[in-house]
Curated annotation (Swiss-Prot):
Single annotated GO MF: mRNA binding
Main location as per UniProt: mitochondrion
Provenance organism: Saccharomyces cerevisiae (strain ATCC 204508 / S288c) (Baker's yeast)
Protein name: Ribonuclease P protein component, mitochondrial
Keywords: Endonuclease, Hydrolase, Mitochondrion, Nuclease, Transit peptide, tRNA processing
Enzymatic reactions: Endonucleolytic cleavage of RNA, removing 5'-extranucleotides from tRNA precursor
Annotated GO CC locations: mitochondrial matrix; mitochondrial ribonuclease P complex; mitochondrion; nucleus; ribonuclease P complex
Misc remark: Present with 1160 molecules/cell in log phase SD medium.
């Protein structure tokens, strides 16, 4: 059990006399749980345990020894100043007595010495009260030293000797001036650290801090107990060890009770919620301690709510909603420990109580389990009253059919079949008339039929058959049929009918973790074992047809049985003389599932095979199967008392008996080497050596002998040691080669092939794990010398983020299998920084064939987020062609959404619509906006009608506004905006569109806008709407410096905000050309207004003291100017030539209205490349030649920056 590794944390070195008694309500279940799970001192002593002292004890002893050396005078005074010291003989005698008798003797000997004894406290060990020595701190050597000290007068050390200690240049720690442990300081320090860890959510550390306080008998306040308990529930340290989590939680809670601290309701909520959740998890994962967890929880629940004065009255407790819900669920899993009336009384008295759907589902379910007809009728009336009230809970109304399904089940199982039938008719008619969901019908009928099958399986089958012939009745789930079949086992013919029906169906079981708590009660749990039960019945009845169908189904549909059924299966296969091929197929299929279970099941599985089949050819096939190596790697001597290894031993013995080929040598040696490392492991070797298991002792000697014989034969045949796994050379160091001829040469043959053959892969994995810097340094050195390395080395380098192109290529080259390839590919992407992904991964020649097929969703997301060119990434991935499959689309749902979002942000609207024909866009808003912005208005209108009911009202308005704006129907856009109520306007977005429409309308009329903007985009739209520069400046000053409008003026207007506004104003000018180009070309006044707005933008940019343009801004500005003057690129080129002609080393290019473009840091090369592209697009060959000629002249005079 997991409890056995936590002896020290319970303080096993203390006596029972030091422990305080727990309260009565906590004794029964908790003490039972502790005594039966090894919580106290009931653990058996491990063999040779003296070789492995507990690390905490070692640390404590070492610390105290060092402290004694630093303060020897304190130790002397504490012993020598006593008036009646113990003699040497008495101390030796007392070493062997119990702590209780020692305390009794010391209370007699030191009754008059209470005021003279001085006792120091240690923060790393338990503190005992005055006059009580801990015998564990005295060794024989100490007793002799102390007896000598009592007879010798203490000599004061010279003052200069102490001064030498004080003059040490680098003290190990700050000098402790306290004569003993200052408990208040110690407590406050720990409180501060616990609070800090709690705030940082470092929950793993908090319990160790509390244990430090506990070891020193310091009791923290209730607030700290609350945080400790909460951290125990939340810490990830023991997420996979439920027993330990519950043990630590209950121990901490009992400590609080023992110290007579009254828990507040917050602590009750933490403890109860954790216990209820723990009991549910234990049930799911078949942990036998689940019932004990629930017993403790319900006992605590009852005790905290019972009023000792009036037993019929419930004490008020402020339980949380989660505690109430999980209590209701746990009640249904472990029924009979509390009455429904008591539970309802407590739940209804809590302020968090809500009469929601889960309350009714859980209560009906519990009343059904306890066969409480009266409670069911009361609940039914209460439910109908709640549903028909003037303002019923919306959740209750939405989930009413879930509740009705439990009501139907309750009526049938308590004998009210006729009432249930009438109610079902009414409900089905109601759903049909209201065009309700098919899932509601399926849920109602499933509950009705499953409950009916418990009462009368034949009648239930007749009803199902009638429903099955109705086209409007949906198909039932696979789980439904399994439960239906389980309830019909007494009628074997009916069972076979149901099994024949579900035999071709896909085995689709719901996951253990449900979406809602009510799903645990509405849908069957633990149905995966029903097939095992069916197989068990068929084996008992010797129904060959059903048996073989189940066995074949398990192979085809990939599922396993409970481990206890396999002996009977193999016995049956032996009786029918099953062929080896089919038998091996069955074994390999089921071994793949056994691989995922614990090691005990693996060896039990082997034992079952060997008990029924001893064929050498079969055992040879098993020992060479893929799963066998995994089984061998799980061999552990710690389990030798729990499981027999006869099956494994038989398979290994078979290695020697059968003929071997040279190809078999590496594998056989590897299997033997793994066993050698397990049998001679330092930690488990004493278990076998000191035990009485003669079979394993003989097996160990046999393995050692066979391994040395195989190694010698391998060497004599002069085979290539590079073919062997690294574990072989490791095992050679563990066996005794003294009695082997040329033992050292044999060892060198296996251990040093790299010295004479650099093609032998070296293993630096463990070196890198233990010392990353040293390991990476050694790897770099050996790589330069031409050595190669194994897969583990490269994997560890990737884990430590030491990644380059060579390591990636080599790692992929030596990757052992496809499963590991998928893991390593995703590990690489998770460890490589985002800025390097394009260079190392996306541009890798193997990206398309190796990386893409193995990418998980999170890895794909990281690549898309960090790729430098999305179009290049899409091309390499072959999107969307390789994403046609629905399964691939479901697996990469988030990645596909991100691709479409980035395409949308990049303005690739036509690409989105084209890809949508192959891989549908799930974001409807994005799809509709892409239709609008690409000019596909008819497609937008058809899609808008098709998906009208799947888009929210506010989103519809925003999309329609954008549609009207893009159609240049500004009047319609303003009308729609004015008709839209404020509550339907999307914050920011709706006003963004409205202010942009005002900007477009400013080409036709003067715009006056009085509402304050909500963001920089609206601010930029308002500024762009101004026709004159004076109006623009006045609007800017009014808004930017107003505290009531926008808080831009924090320490001066931030440069980031200014840049956003200017970029958005420039984008507005560019969008106006796209949207209004036909009108502007035909209307001179509009063209003049555009020219004025461009000029206003340039002047405003200079006014804000940010005249510099980057390359993107320059491109956009040139595009706008080119619309007004097609010769703008040529004018820019002429300006550049003149600037360079005047000053060859010019740092910037001066443009109109004082704008500047920097020619430093690749700027000159970028502008030339842009001009060349621009002239190529316009087909201006003459200017293209001029740009190229100018570039060549510049190269001669000074090198252009690449």
């Amino acid at each position: 059990m997991a409890f056995k590794s936590f002896i020290y944390s319970k303080g096993y070195h203390r006596s029972a006399a030091q422990k305080k008694t727990a309260t009565s309500f906590f004794d029964s279940s908790y003490q039972y749980l502790r005594q039966n799970q090894g919580l106290v001192n009931s653990d058996p002593v491990l063999h040779a345990s003296h070789l492995h002292p507990h690390p905490v004890v070692v640390a404590n002893v070492n610390y105290n020894n060092v402290d004694d050396i630093l303060h020897p005078h304190d130790l002397d005074s504490s012993i020598n100043n006593t008036n009646n010291p113990l003699t040497h003989e008495e101390l030796l005698y007392n070493q062997n007595v119990s702590l209780r008798s020692l305390k009794q003797q010391q209370s007699t000997n030191y009754v008059n010495n209470n005021n003279n004894n001085q006792h120091r406290y240690y923060s790393t060990g338990p503190t005992l009260p005055t006059n009580q020595y801990d015998p564990l701190n005295f060794s024989n050597r100490n007793f002799q030293d102390l007896s000598l000290k009592t007879s010798q007068p203490s000599v004061q050390q010279p003052q200069n000797e102490y001064s030498l200690l004080k003059d040490e240049n680098a003290p190990v720690w700050k000098e402790d001036t306290e004569p003993c442990l200052n408990k208040s300081t110690y407590l406050q320090t720990h409180i501060d650290e616990i609070n800090r860890c709690y705030e940082q959510k470092n929950y793993n550390k908090i319990n160790s801090l509390y244990q430090s306080l506990k070891r020193n008998d310091i009791v923290p306040p209730l607030e700290i107990f609350t945080k400790v308990l909460d951290s125990l529930c939340k810490r990830p340290l023991d997420n996979n060890d439920l027993d330990n989590k519950m043990y630590e939680l209950l121990t901490c809670y009992q400590d609080m009770i023992n110290n007579r601290l009254k828990p507040p309701d917050e602590i009750y909520n933490i403890v109860l919620l954790s216990l209820f959740k723990g009991s549910i998890l234990a049930y799911q994962f078949e942990n036998p301690n689940g019932s004990d967890f629930y017993k403790i929880a319900i006992e605590l629940f009852n005790t905290t709510t019972n009023d000792p004065k009036q037993k019929s009255v419930v004490k008020f407790r402020n339980f949380s909603k989660d505690v109430l819900d999980y209590n209701l669920l746990a009640m249904n899993i472990y029924p009979g420990h509390i009455t429904l009336s008591k539970a309802q009384q407590v739940i209804k008295s809590s302020p968090a109580f809500i009469k929601d759907s889960f309350y009714f589902i859980a209560c009906f379910s519990y009343a059904k389990l306890t066969n409480d007809k009266f409670a069911i009728k009361e609940l039914y009336e209460d439910f109908r009253l709640s549903l028909s009230s003037g303002s019923p809970d919306q959740g209750l109304f939405d989930d009413q059919f879930e509740i009705y399904s439990v009501i139907l089940s309750s009526f049938i199982e308590t004998g009210e079949v006729e009432l249930a039938t009438n109610l079902l008719d009414d409900l089905v008619s109601k759903i049909q008339s209201s065009n309700g969901l098919a899932s509601n019908i399926s849920l109602l009928l499933s509950s009705f039929l499953i409950s009916m099958s418990k009462v009368d399986p034949s009648k239930a089958y007749e009803i199902w058959f009638k429903f099955h012939n109705l086209n409007w009745i949906p198909e039932f789930s696979y789980e439904f049929y399994l439960v239906f079949m389980a309830n019909s086992f007494q009628d074997w013919n009916l069972t076979k009918k149901i099994y024949d029906y579900i035999f071709p169906m896909e085995r689709n079981l719901s996951p253990l973790k449900k979406q809602k708590l009510s799903d645990y009660l509405l849908h069957p749990i633990g149905v995966d074992s029903i097939t095992t039960s069916l197989l068990d019945y068929s084996l008992q009845l010797k129904d060959n047809e059903v048996i073989m169908k189940i066995l074949e189904e398990s192979i085809v549909k990939n599922f396993s049985f409970d481990i206890g059924i396999y002996p009977f299966v193999f016995n049956y296969l032996r009786e029918i003389q099953c062929g080896e091929d089919y038998l091996m197929r069955f074994i390999e299929s089921h071994a793949e599932f056994i691989k995922k279970s614990n090691s005990i099941n693996k060896f039990q599985f082997l034992n079952m095979i060997v008990d029924n089949f001893q064929s050498q050819s079969l055992l040879n096939k098993i020992s060479h199967a893929k799963f066998f190596k995994n089984f061998v790697e799980d061999f552990n001597l710690e389990n030798c008392e729990l499981v027999s290894y006869n099956g494994l031993i038989s398979c290994i013995n078979n290695f020697i008996k059968i003929p071997k080929t040279i190809k078999d040598f590496p594998y056989i040696l590897e299997i033997h080497a793994i066993l050698v490392t397990k049998l001679f492991d330092f930690d488990t070797y004493p278990i076998l050596q000191n035990g009485n298991n003669e079979v394993l002792l003989k097996f160990r000697d046999q393995i050692e002998h066979q391994f040395k014989m195989l190694a010698q034969n391998f060497c004599r045949l002069n085979l290539d040691p590079n073919l062997l796994a690294g574990v072989v050379s490791q095992a050679m160091k563990m066996v005794n080669l003294d009695d082997t001829a040329n033992g050292q040469d044999l060892l060198n043959f296996f251990n040093h092939p790299g010295d004479w053959d650099k093609s032998y892969p070296l293993s630096l994995g463990s070196f890198i794990r233990n010392s990353p810097r040293g390991g990476i340094r050694e790897f770099t050195k050996l790589s330069k010398e031409g050595y190669c390395f194994d897969y583990d080395t490269y994997k560890e380098l990737i884990i430590k983020r030491a990644i380059n192109k060579q390591i990636i290529d080599k790692c992929l080259e030596v990757c052992p299998d496809s499963i590991e390839l998928k893991n390593i590919v995703n590990l690489m992407i998770s460890k490589i920084p985002g800025r390097n992904l394009t260079q190392l991964i996306i541009n890798n020649p193997k990206f398309s064939k190796v990386f893409v097929p193995n990418l998980r969703n999170d890895s794909m997301l990281k690549l898309i987020e960090n790729c430098e060119s999305l179009s290049n990434f899409i091309r390499i991935c072959d999107f969307p062609e390789k994403f046609k499959s629905i399964a691939i689309q479901a697996e990469n749902k988030n990645a596909i959404e991100l691709i479409y979002e980035r395409l949308f942000d990049g303005g690739k609207y036509a690409d989105i619509l084209r890809y949508n024909n192959i891989v549908p866009v799930l974001n409807l808003e994005l799809l509709l906006k892409s239709c609008i912005r690409s000019g596909e208005f008819k497609k937008y209108e058809s899609l808008s009608k098709k998906f009208n009911d799947k888009i929210s009202e506010s989103s519809k308005i925003d999309i329609q506004l954008e549609y009207l704006i893009n159609k240049n129907d500004l009047k319609g856009a303003f009308t729609l905006f004015e008709k839209t109520p404020r509550e339907l306007r999307t914050p920011h977005k709706t006003m963004d569109l409205y202010t942009f429409a005002l900007f477009l309308d400013s080409f036709n009329r003067n715009i006056t806008y009085y509402e304050s903007p909500e963001n920089t985009l609206q601010f930029a739209n308002i500024l762009s709407s101004q026709t004159s520069f004076i109006n623009l400046l006045s609007t800017y000053n009014l808004i930017a410096h107003s505290d009531h409008l926008m808080n831009f003026n924090v320490g001066g207007m931030a440069a980031k905000v200014k840049k956003e506004i200017l970029n958005q104003m420039l984008n507005n000018l560019y969008d106006s050309i796209r949207l209004l180009s036909p009108s502007i070309e035909n209307d001179k006044s509009m063209k003049e207004k555009l020219r004025e707005k461009v000029k206003n933008y340039c002047r405003f940019k200079a006014y804000l003291k940010s005249p510099e343009l980057d390359m993107d801004e320059l491109k956009t500005l040139v595009s706008v100017e080119s619309f007004l003057n097609p010769f703008t690129p040529s004018m820019l080129f002429n300006n550049l030539i003149e600037t360079i002609y005047i000053n060859e080393h010019a740092s910037s290019l001066v443009l109109q209205n004082g704008l500047i473009y920097s020619l430093q840091q690749k700027g000159l090369n970028k502008i030339l490349s842009y001009l060349e592209e621009s002239f190529i697009t316009s087909g201006n060959d003459a200017n293209i030649e001029k740009v190229r000629e100018f570039r060549s002249l510049l190269r001669k005079s000074k090198p252009l920056q690449a």
